[in-house]
Design a protein with these regions (language model features):
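Short amphipathic alpha-helical segments, especially helix-boundary/capping motifs
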Residues: 31-34, 80-82, 105-109, 151-155
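Non-cytosolic head/periplasmic domains of membrane-anchored proteins
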Residues: 115-162, 167-171
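Short loop segments at secondary-structure junctions
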Residues: 52-54, 111, 137-139
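Generic, low-specificity signal for short hydrophobic/alpha-helical stretches with a mild N-terminal bias
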Residues: 30-32, 39-40, 89, 100, ...
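Hydrophobic ligand-binding cavity/cleft-lining segments
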Residues: 6, 10-85
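Glycine-rich portal/gate segments that line the openings of hydrophobic small-molecule binding cavities
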Residues: 4, 49, 65-71, 75-124, ...
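A conserved amphipathic terminal alpha-helix motif
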Residues: 3, 20-27, 148-192
Length: 192
């Protein structure tokens, strides 16, 4: 093999390894959790007002986890194990324009009717902790979302965190739209 051919083969192999590493990281199949140069950034905060009382909103959020997961959510959620008010669940989120699916494994803890907490076990970053706080306001509920996302490897990890956080927050906002619609449907006067 000539020197040029060897260099080309080395570049091709490096590109292949980098592509595989990117795929495994993005999809959550491999989590790099070294703690080296760990940086933590906030997720949120943001809020949404739902025209339904906190117990109804809580039940809408908790039902797919604590009860039977609806068939319509099968492509988004799989509960691995249930134990009282805590579950271990996989969440699936389309990324890269739907070409890939990011999978996260998270514990989800329920404190009826005011708090749902999420903690990442495995995913595209080594650390995520987040919560939904439900506060009654008249006949409505304010859902407040807060959290934090941590990555390793200093500036490189910070760059990755910016990309992951944008997709993460977009997924939460999208889920809030569904929560709002279903909770308000359940609380509509025609349902009483």
């Amino acid at each position: 093999m000539t020197r040029g051919a060897a260099a080309a083969a080395g570049v091709a192999a490096s590109a292949g390894i980098a592509g595989l590493a990117h795929y495994l990281t993005v999809t959550g199949r491999v989590t790099l959790d070294t703690g080296w140069g760990r940086r933590v950034r906030p997720l949120g905060p943001f809020t949404i007002e739902v025209a339904a009382p906190p117990p109804v909103v809580f039940d809408v959020i908790a039902a797919p986890y604590l009860g039977r997961t609806p068939r319509a959510m099968a492509g988004k959620l799989r509960v691995v194990e249930r134990r009282g008010d805590m579950v271990l669940a996989e969440h699936y989120t389309p990324v890269h324009g739907g070409r890939l699916t990011a999978a996260t494994l998270e514990t989800v803890a329920f404190d009826r009717p005011h708090r749902i907490g999420f903690r990442l076990v495995r995913g595209p970053v080594p650390h995520v902790a987040e919560e939904f706080r439900l506060t009654g306001q008249g006949a409505a509920t304010i859902i407040e979302y807060t959290g934090e996302l941590g990555t390793d490897f200093g500036i490189a990890g910070q760059w990755w965190a910016t990309r992951v956080a944008a997709a993460w927050e977009a997924a939460v906002r999208h889920s809030f739209d569904g929560i709002k619609a279903e909770a308000e449907r359940r609380s509509s006067p025609g349902r009483q």
